[in-house]
């Protein structure tokens, strides 16, 4: 009989690579600031709100660059009014009326 070889070493290696990639993505995301607690001083609250504002600005910022180009091109093709740029002709040229 022929022994069937199981690909478990390959599956384990793929799982480890996937976990490493996911770990790198998690580290790239900014960490949410820790709340100071109920008995915090006004200076600590001020620092917390400043860091929270900075965190929210990072998370919700608009991203410019290559992602914007296809959408802008698509909207330009769909929503431009080309009738202003076309010359006005009441009759087709070269066609004799009878």
Curated annotation (Swiss-Prot):
A Pfam family annotated for this UniProt entry: Hormone_3
Post-translation changes: The peptide YY form is cleaved at Pro-30 by the prolyl endopeptidase FAP (seprase) activity (in vitro) to generate peptide YY(3-36).
Modified residues (Phosphoserine): 41
GO molecular function: G protein-coupled receptor binding; neuropeptide hormone activity; neuropeptide Y receptor binding
Modified residues (Tyrosine amide): 64
Superkingdom, natural source: Eukaryota
Span of the signal peptide: 1-28
Residues the record marks as site: Cleavage: 30-31
Cellular component GO terms held in the UniProt record: extracellular space
Subcellular location: Secreted
Keyword Phosphoprotein tagged: yes
Transmembrane residue ranges: none
Chief location category: secreted
Function: This gut peptide inhibits exocrine pancreatic secretion, has a vasoconstrictory action and inhibitis jejunal and colonic mobility.
Family recorded in the similarity comment: Belongs to the NPY family.
Record's protein name: Peptide YY
Record organism: Rattus norvegicus
Gene: Pyy
């Amino acid at each position: 009989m022929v022994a069937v070889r199981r690909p478990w070493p390959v599956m384990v290696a793929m799982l480890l690579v996937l976990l490493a990639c996911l770990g790198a993505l998690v580290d790239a995301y900014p960490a949410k600031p820790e709340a100071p607690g109920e008995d915090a001083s006004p200076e600590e609250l001020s620092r917390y709100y400043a860091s929270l504002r900075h965190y929210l600005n990072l998370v919700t910022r608009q991203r410019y660059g290559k992602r914007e180009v296809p959408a802008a091109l698509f909207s330009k093709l769909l929503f431009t009014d080309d009738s202003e740029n076309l010359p006005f002709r009441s009759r087709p040229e070269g066609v004799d009326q009878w």
